[in-house]
Amino acid sequence: MIKTKEVTFVTILIVLCVFISTIHAKRYIEYPIRLDLGKGCDPRFPTAACYKRTPANPYRRPCTTANRCRRSTSSTRVPSLKTFVEIPPM
């Protein structure tokens, strides 16, 4: 009885080893692609080059009338600096 169990166990082990060896195992687990990572970046080992760069200070000064910025709704004409400061010829 014990001999039969040993033979059955060894036979099952051999069959399992044959089936396991024929399966093509992957070297690593493939994760779904994340959109915030750059192309070719590994999510397990992200580097600074993988992420989209954002400026340290994204604040921009607003455009004022004194700066004479281009405006689409501006109907008033801003006078130039020469009209405010007229230097008489000497």
UniProtKB/Swiss-Prot annotation:
Pfam families attached to this UniProt entry: RALF (PF05498)
Record-annotated disulphide pairs: 41-50, 63-69
Key words of the record: Disulfide bond, Hormone, Secreted, Signal
Keyword Transmembrane helix: no
Main subcellular location: secreted
Keyword Disulfide bond: yes
GO CC, one annotated term: apoplast
Signal peptide range: 1-25
Superkingdom, natural source: Eukaryota
Subcellular location: Secreted
GO molecular function, one term: hormone activity
GO biological process: calcium-mediated signaling; cell-cell signaling; regulation of growth
Known role: Cell signaling peptide that may regulate plant stress, growth, and development. Mediates a rapid alkalinization of extracellular space by mediating a transient increase in the cytoplasmic Ca(2+) concentration leading to a calcium-dependent signaling events through a cell surface receptor and a concomitant activation of some intracellular mitogen-activated protein kinases.
Family: Belongs to the plant rapid alkalinization factor (RALF) family.
The protein, known as: Protein RALF-like 29
Protein's organism: Arabidopsis thaliana
Lineage, highest ranks first: Eukaryota, Viridiplantae, Streptophyta, Embryophyta, Tracheophyta
